[in-house]
Design a protein with these regions (language model features):
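Short, well-structured N-terminal submotif of metal-dependent ribonuclease cores
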Residues: 1-41
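Acidic, PIN/NYN-like endoribonuclease modules and their adjacent C-terminal/linker elements
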Residues: 2, 38-39, 113-145
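Acidic active-site catalytic centers that drive phospho-/nucleotidyl reactions
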Residues: 11, 105, 123
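Alpha-helix capping/helix-boundary segments
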Residues: 14-15, 43, 108, 125-126
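Residue-level signal for well-ordered alpha-helical positions
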Residues: 21-22, 50, 132
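Glycine-rich, phosphate-binding/catalytic loops in enzymes
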Residues: 25-28, 55, 136-138
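PIN-domain endoribonuclease scaffold, especially VapC-family toxins
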Residues: 33, 41-93
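Active-site neighborhoods of divalent-metal-dependent phosphate/nucleic-acid chemistry enzymes
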Residues: 80-118
């Protein structure tokens, strides 16, 4: 019997953890054949935009910042970048679920609704939206299910 591929939507903060750390990238790489990791394209753009500021705040060298940007491009081999054509029709439903929280996160919620999948995040804004959320500290439970 073949096992059904799991799907999970990644928030931008997970992409940041994957490019600046080791554990998150390793978790994704280890599970790439069992889990379809995906994220809205806006998350890749958000990470690329904020990475220089994050690097400066963390005193990360320019060379390491460039390595992180290269890793971000490598992630596209592991994490599918999904276009708004897939989830755009769920925008209003997503905004209704987010409520007065961070409305910029609508694409992540809409993609999760479109794919009927959970979200991997460290952001509290997704809790209470009616979508299962996983944090890095317990994501391996999701992988094992």
């Amino acid at each position: 019997m073949t096992q059904k591929l799991k799907i999970i939507v990644l928030d931008a903060n997970i992409l940041i953890r994957a490019v600046l750390g080791i554990r998150t990238f390793s978790l994704i790489a280890e599970q790439k054949d069992k889990v379809l990791f995906c994220t809205p394209g806006v998350c890749y753009r958000e990470v690329a935009f904020h990475l220089p500021t994050i690097a400066q705040k963390r005193n990360i060298s320019f060379a390491m910042e460039q390595k992180a940007l290269n890793t971000l491009n490598e992630l596209k081999q592991l994490i599918a970048e999904i276009g708004e054509d897939v989830y755009g029709s769920f925008k209003q439903r997503a905004l209704n679920r987010i409520g007065d929280r961070d409305e910029k996160d609508w694409a992540i919620v809409a993609l999760a609704i479109a794919l009927d999948s959970p979200i991997w995040t460290e952001d509290q804004d997704f809790f209470g939206t009616g979508i299962a959320t996983w944090r890095t500290k317990n994501i391996e439970i999701f992988f094992a299910q």
